[in-house]
Amino acid sequence: MALLNVISENPLTLQPGQVIAFDHLANGEHWQWALGTVVSSDKHVVVVEQWAVNEGSCETLKHNISSEIQKEMKRMGVFQEQLSSARDKLAAIRSENEDRVSAARAVFEDAKARVASVDEVHMREVTSQACPSPVAVEVLKSVLALAQNDPTVTNCSTWDDIRMEYRRPNAIADFISADITGKTYPNAEEICSSLNEQRLSSLAASRDSEAISSLHHWVLSALAYQEAYCRLTTDTRVQEQNDAIANCIAGMKGCRLKVMKLKEELERGGTPTFGGQLTSFTKTSVQLKAPLSSVISIVGVDPSAQDCVLTDDEVGLILDKAEQTRLQINDHFSHLSNSYMEAMAELHCLSMYTSELEERRLNLQERFVFSLFTNAGKTNAPRRERIETDVGLRSVEAPRGDSANNIKDLQEIIKELSSHDERWMYRNEPTVTTKHRKSYPGREWSKVVERKPEELLSTFRTEQAAACHVPEDAIRNIEFTATSEKLQVSFDVQHPVKQTAAEINKRLQEFPSRGMDRMLCDVDQPKKGLDRAIVEVCRAFDLREHAFRGMTFDKFIEEVAMKGRVGDKDAYESEIGDLLMLLDKIHNENRSLQYTLEKSAEEFRRQTASTMREQESLRQRNGELHAEIGRLRDLVEKLRDLADNQASELELLKLQKTQANQIRAQRNLSTFRGDDTAEPVYCVTLDELREQTEHCDQVERELERQREQCQNLLNAQDDLLAELSGVSEEKEKLEAECERLEAELRQMEEKSRLSEQGLSEMTQRLEEKQAEIEGLLENLEQLDEQLEALRAAEKSAQAHIEARDREISDLQQRLEGEIDDHIKTTALLEELRKHYNNLEELFDKQEAELMAYREKRQNAHKVRSLEPTLRPIGTQTKPFQEMVSADEISSEPLLSVTLDEYNDHMHRSNQFQQENDLLRQQLQQANDERENLHDRLEQLMAENQSLSEQLHNMHEELEREERDRSGVTLQNERLAEEIQRKTAENEQLVLENNKSRSDIRNLNVQVQRLMEELELKAAENEKLAEELELKAAENEKLAEELELKVAENEKLAEELELKVAENEKLAEELELKAAENEKLAEELELKAAENEKLAEELELKAAENEKLAEELELKAAENEKLAEELELKAAENEKLAEELELKAAENEKLAEELELKAAENEKLAEELELKVAENEKLAEELELKAAENEKLAEELELKVAENEKLAEELELKAAENEKLAEELELKAAENEKLAEELELKAAENEKLAEELELKAAENEKLAEELELKVAENEKLAEELELKAAENEKLAEELELKVAENEKLAEELELKAAENEKLAEELELKVAENEKLAEELELKAAENEKLAEELELKVAENEKLAEELELKAAENEKLAEELELKAAENEKLAEELELKAAENEKLAEELELKAAENEKLAEELELKAAENEKLAEELELKVAENEKLAEELELKAAENEKLAEELELKVAENEKLAEELELKAAENEKLAEELELKAAENEKLAEELELKAAENEKLAEELELKVAENKRLAEEVTQRLSEKELLAEDTSARLLEADSANSALQCKVKHLEEKLTLLSSEKETALATLEAEIVDLLTQLKGLNGTNSALESLCASKEKELVFLREHCELWTDPTTKKEKVITRHVKVFDGNEWMKLITDRPEALMSAFVIDAGNACHVPGDQIHEVSFLNNKEKH
């Protein structure tokens, strides 16, 4: 059966169509996972259609990725819908629960007011009744149980106990003011059901009295309020919705990460493989059978899909699950093999046992049959045959009877043992009470009864309850009668009706008297429990102990009350109760202090161990980081040297190639078709290397900081150890004070005893009473002082513990910070490794490029040397594998023409010589046209001067506005200090922007210098007009690029303004959060102030008590008044104690409120996570907007293409104008002036951007002022919260207004275009300039052709070529500088994007709060109007430079791509951080699993020990079986000997028969006639004998089966018998001494109220546990040591 249970496990249920990941052996060597669609499955095998890895074309893979992105977006939409519905449900559930709580609270408050209005006299009348009504008793019990949160009150308290509780002053007020919601009453349903019955309903309560009716209503309303309040935290629907929200967020996050990876792979355009980011699969029709145990997991893929894509995260999860399943399968297989081996061993033993039994059965059968046939062969022995058949039947039937009897005996023994099973459980059944007696022999029972009556009573009740299998309260009316020889006990037993009195008597007689015998033996041991309490009370009140010997505690209290020690019974009882309460409080406080110290010490040790482990791990990691940094530095140095060696060679080769290509292009030759070399990367690589070195230095500084933090942690640990030693010393002081208190009490007892002996007369008795009263007062004062000292010590200890807890929390926070720093350093190292890999790849590429250049260079030298007409190169050729110095390459001539091209060039030069005359004439015409263009350009210059004057006026107006704004900034300087952190970030952005602007200015200066050089060259070389036109075109391009940069800066300024506004919003939201936190802190401070006030009140009360004590000492003569005042003061002390309890309850409430606040903070954190998810949605929308912008850029490019077509048409028309060549110089000068004007405009745009930034700063300051005003006006904040919905509507209206403003802006643009005075002239001039530029470009193209022909014909080609080469080199330098500037701009853009990402996060939170400030909205509208004016002016200026805007859009698209790449990098970093967190969580889980495994190993060790014990028992049983088999063999031999004796007897009898026959020969003749009859009878007898033998054989076969079944039944019964004997309750203490060993055990009890038992009834709990543990282990109770109780809540 064990093997069957192991094999038959629940298989995994799969549905057809599901996509699963499963394991299979690839090539029979190693495991590999694959995807498959389930076709069918049974209990052990699953048939799947396998998915193959997609290795098709890139287009197919891109299609798969795009379809997967669409699927994930759909899933994200489904998750979003589920999230919104879950949020709505959660809000509805919470509102429903809160409404229920508010309604129940209102009813409860009404009931409390109704109870408070009841007269106290009326309540005393109710409690003074001797026989109250059942409804009154039940209601008062319910109120008491509910106020004390003790359900035992309703079952165990009597009417006298209830009266005592309600007699206390202000008892009703205390009960109704109890914390109902603090603790949940466990048996609320019982009270509700009982109070809703007809005889205990509200009608019955109202008929009884008004007080009972109000209390009845209070109980029901309190239970309803408690239930509604518990629903707030225990409502499972809330947790379900929270789980649904968490699942939706996790699903959205997973979808988003997968979409990001898919988009990244789609943009990269590579082929996804197993080693990359993605893995693509395609569904095939190949079916495969796989075992069901090889299924790893179910993959979330649409069954209808034909292809799918998995990310590396999903693949990693599948691989982890595959490893887990393989480990589980191996474990299961080993378990199966062990079970199989056990089953095979058991089967082998059974087969051997059955074969042996079969051999024995065959031997017995053969002997039996042989004896039958031998006896049947003899003649004239019918009697003998009958005897043998009878004996055979008896021998056959004997085993059956013996085994049946054995089974019956075993069943009877088992039945008897099961009736004495110690694992009995009491069931609630109808009961009956019977009278019983029991006697115990012994001569010292009278001594036991006299010395330990309470212990004797509890021991007897426990023992008899265990004997009768009933609870202890079922043993009643116990009477002890002790004689000189025995103890006679009579008692009543309440037992179930199905048990008779005879059965109970039998149980009582059979049960061993273990506890009673121990009491008789330990009669001289010290007293304990209530017996000790009687002695302590007698000593405290100076009573004679011998007067109360043999009395129980209840009788003792009655006798003491009858003595009339203090005139009033109630006062005396209250004094005794006060003393007992004081003692109990002292012990409880000491115990609680001990417990807290132990817990704090354990916690401190645990924290210290964890910190040491973390410090050790940090040290190891620091060492690794140092080694890694050293290695990286070495690599950086090597790469730097290598880069320096190869940079010069590579740059020279590139320069030669570019120069050759330019010269070839100028001469209409095709460019080289060799592989393009990479861009100059060595400069960028050095910068990156410098950055990495700076990162290494930062890592070193972080390591030093971590070392300092570790040292600080060690110092904090030493401080904590010192504090712990101080707390332990305080604990020892408290214990010493407790001992001193006990010694003083004993001294007072001795003094009172001595004073009693000297008194004889009544007057002396009065004096003795006065002395006793004074002694009691002194004791009370001392006790009060000691209690105050204990409380102060407890407060100080608690303060130390709280301080230590705070330090531990600080240590945890520091450790978390160090872990974060460590994670950051690891991330930096990973980035360094990636960068190092990139450098290696670049190095390999550069080396391959150098090899290709060297090989080309060597081939060119070889080919040149073979040509006789060309001059050979003087340098020696080297193998292309060797390095060539830069000087050698620079000294060589530039090779840019092939031989064929050179020959063609010579042939064409002859042709061009013939056409030279014609071209000269055309040049003359071009000069004439140029003069005309010069005149027109002068007119345009005058018009441009007028426009510049207008711009100058506008600039002056802007300056005046700046002065006005500066005045506003001076007024807001006092607010600038509060926003330094936010403005610092913006200032950094501004500085970076200024850097970019300074770079642009430098470029402008360089452009001016180039333009001046071009003018000089144009003046010197009139013949090179065509080249000047080319340069002018290049200058125009540069100007356009400058304008693009300016527009880019303007866009950046606008984005900065938006970010500033978003920062302001986020600042507002942060300040609101800070205000809420300040409110919470103020509430906490108020609560702390209330606690301090309570402490001060307690101190005042203590001072009042001292004053009262002094007054009592002065009025010692007035005994009666002193007694009354003592009673009053005792009542006041009780009130104070109750007030202390109430304050403690209030403190508990405050702690619970703090926990609720913490839960609310957690909810806020969850809401923040949701906000982050919404922000991610907005980021996706921004990406969509970026895509739209890209589309717009494409449309602009189309427009540019159309413009180019128009330009071509204009060029055709300009070909007819021959005079354009003359106007070229004038146009160049005008273009220079235009470039200068553009630079001025760029400067003006920069100023405008700065003004916009100032505006943003002003807006921030205004926002901060508004936030301060909001913080100062809390009432306004509440109203603003109420008007949040209205503000949201206003925000929507504002958005509509913004849209309208945008429309107005568009209209203004149209109107600005219509303004003829300001804009038409400028636009016309710009259009004319553009047309002229296009015409110039057409002429430049024609002139280029002419210049090329002239260069071929003119002898001055060499000079021109050299000048052109110099210009090309300068242009290349400029291009390189521009590339460097572009790289710097990209870096600045990346930094701006990082800042923008941070600002976006802040902005998304601030946008929600932006609508709350109406004044700010109005001011923002005013500012928006001003900005719109500025925007209009900027648009007018932007309209002048359309081409620059187009290039700006292209740059913006590139920047957006870079921003997306940055976002992807940030997402990857976040993924790495999350993976690190997951790894940390997995490590913690592994640690927990290791602990669980250790616990399981311990359990397995215990099970192995049990198995060993069972094996020993089985060995003993086998020995018993062997002994039984031997006994059976002996019985068989005895029976065989008996058969032989019977054979001898029969032979003797035959002889006698022969003698009789000889004597009776005379009668033979008479018998001869009967011979024939006898012969026939003999034949018939033989036939019957044969039939009987056959029947016996069949019976033997049947008996063998029954014997085997009976033997198995006997074996099972014997096992059951052994088990029941082990758990039999009739065990006795061992009489002989044996070796003992002490072991530690743990037992867990389920339940919610164990903490209350531990605190309220520790002694009862200890005694009950010791009794149960002793009975379970079959040892006396005094052998149960070191019992400690630990509540499950304290473990966590």
Curated annotation (Swiss-Prot):
<feature type="repeat" description="2">
    <location>
        <begin position="1026"/>
        <end position="1039"/>
    </location>
</feature>
<keyword id="KW-0282">Flagellum</keyword>
<feature type="repeat" description="8">
    <location>
        <begin position="1110"/>
        <end position="1123"/>
    </location>
</feature>
<comment type="function">
    <text>A component of FAZ filament that is required for correct FAZ assembly and attachment. Not essential for new flagellum growth.</text>
</comment>
<keyword id="KW-0175">Coiled coil</keyword>
<feature type="repeat" description="26">
    <location>
        <begin position="1362"/>
        <end position="1375"/>
    </location>
</feature>
<keyword id="KW-0969">Cilium</keyword>
<feature type="repeat" description="7">
    <location>
        <begin position="1096"/>
        <end position="1109"/>
    </location>
</feature>
<keyword id="KW-0966">Cell projection</keyword>
<feature type="repeat" description="27">
    <location>
        <begin position="1376"/>
        <end position="1389"/>
    </location>
</feature>
<feature type="repeat" description="22">
    <location>
        <begin position="1306"/>
        <end position="1319"/>
    </location>
</feature>
<feature type="repeat" description="32">
    <location>
        <begin position="1446"/>
        <end position="1459"/>
    </location>
</feature>
<feature type="repeat" description="17">
    <location>
        <begin position="1236"/>
        <end position="1249"/>
    </location>
</feature>
<dbReference type="GO" id="GO:0005929">
    <property type="term" value="C:cilium"/>
</dbReference>
<feature type="region of interest" description="37 X 14 AA tandem repeats of E-E-L-E-L-K-[VA]-A-E-N-E-K-L-A">
    <location>
        <begin position="1012"/>
        <end position="1529"/>
    </location>
</feature>
<feature type="repeat" description="4">
    <location>
        <begin position="1054"/>
        <end position="1067"/>
    </location>
</feature>
<feature type="repeat" description="35">
    <location>
        <begin position="1488"/>
        <end position="1501"/>
    </location>
</feature>
<dbReference type="GO" id="GO:0005856">
    <property type="term" value="C:cytoskeleton"/>
</dbReference>
<feature type="repeat" description="19">
    <location>
        <begin position="1264"/>
        <end position="1277"/>
    </location>
</feature>
<feature type="repeat" description="34">
    <location>
        <begin position="1474"/>
        <end position="1487"/>
    </location>
</feature>
<dbReference type="GO" id="GO:0000281">
    <property type="term" value="P:mitotic cytokinesis"/>
</dbReference>
<keyword id="KW-0677">Repeat</keyword>
<feature type="repeat" description="24">
    <location>
        <begin position="1334"/>
        <end position="1347"/>
    </location>
</feature>
<feature type="repeat" description="13">
    <location>
        <begin position="1180"/>
        <end position="1193"/>
    </location>
</feature>
<dbReference type="Pfam" id="PF23404">
    <property type="entry name" value="FAZ1_C"/>
</dbReference>
<feature type="repeat" description="6">
    <location>
        <begin position="1082"/>
        <end position="1095"/>
    </location>
</feature>
<dbReference type="GO" id="GO:0120119">
    <property type="term" value="C:flagellum attachment zone"/>
</dbReference>
<dbReference type="GO" id="GO:0020016">
    <property type="term" value="C:ciliary pocket"/>
</dbReference>
<dbReference type="InterPro" id="IPR056615">
    <property type="entry name" value="FAZ1_C"/>
</dbReference>
<feature type="repeat" description="3">
    <location>
        <begin position="1040"/>
        <end position="1053"/>
    </location>
</feature>
<feature type="repeat" description="31">
    <location>
        <begin position="1432"/>
        <end position="1445"/>
    </location>
</feature>
<feature type="repeat" description="21">
    <location>
        <begin position="1292"/>
        <end position="1305"/>
    </location>
</feature>
<feature type="repeat" description="10">
    <location>
        <begin position="1138"/>
        <end position="1151"/>
    </location>
</feature>
<feature type="coiled-coil region">
    <location>
        <begin position="903"/>
        <end position="1607"/>
    </location>
</feature>
<feature type="repeat" description="18">
    <location>
        <begin position="1250"/>
        <end position="1263"/>
    </location>
</feature>
<protein>
    <recommendedName>
        <fullName>Flagellar attachment zone protein 1</fullName>
    </recommendedName>
</protein>
<feature type="repeat" description="37">
    <location>
        <begin position="1516"/>
        <end position="1529"/>
    </location>
</feature>
<feature type="repeat" description="1">
    <location>
        <begin position="1012"/>
        <end position="1025"/>
    </location>
</feature>
<feature type="repeat" description="30">
    <location>
        <begin position="1418"/>
        <end position="1431"/>
    </location>
</feature>
<dbReference type="GO" id="GO:0060271">
    <property type="term" value="P:cilium assembly"/>
</dbReference>
<feature type="repeat" description="16">
    <location>
        <begin position="1222"/>
        <end position="1235"/>
    </location>
</feature>
<dbReference type="InterPro" id="IPR056614">
    <property type="entry name" value="FAZ1_cons"/>
</dbReference>
